[in-house]
Amino acid sequence: MKIYFTASTAEFNKYKKTYFAIRDYLVQENHTLTRDWLKHTGERIKEGDLNVSDIKKIYNKCVLAINQAQLVIIEDTVSNFSTGHQITLALQKQKPTLVLWQGKKHRYFNQMFIHGIDSEHLEIAQYKPTNLETIINTFINKYQDYNNKTRFNLVLNQYERNYLDWVQFNRATSRTKIIKNALKEKIDED
């Protein structure tokens, strides 16, 4: 699959082993990275080339890579505006997006702002190095045939149809979305 993988460069040296582990695993599993930036960025940091005069070019490459991707994976242990913006772009483009962070994030509340995003395309996972590949595999496998849509006819009794009509009118949500959300809840439960 075509995957856009990114992470923050804010603490690059501290987390580069993890970033490269994710990148290398995706490549090893024969996925195509729509933007393979880690090696180049690591070299720039190592050489002390911190003057980013080409930031508009980098931004446009990131946007293009998100557009070309089938899936987006963002390592967000070090949250910042950049990763948050890329999460938003991916979700606006309706790209299935996995947001990862290692260990417990420093926060006062048990949920963060990102947990308030109501999107069927967003998955958030806390990982340890021992289960990182499993989390990534589960995410990729879930969306392996994501673009293969199947039409399905459903027979409802009048009571069920009335309920769907009522929810559609009162909550401004399509009947299809209501049914898909109920199915997703059941899938997640099982």
Residue ranges with predicted function:
Residues 1-85, 89-190:
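Conserved catalytic or regulatory cores that recognize and/or transform ribose-phosphate-containing ligands
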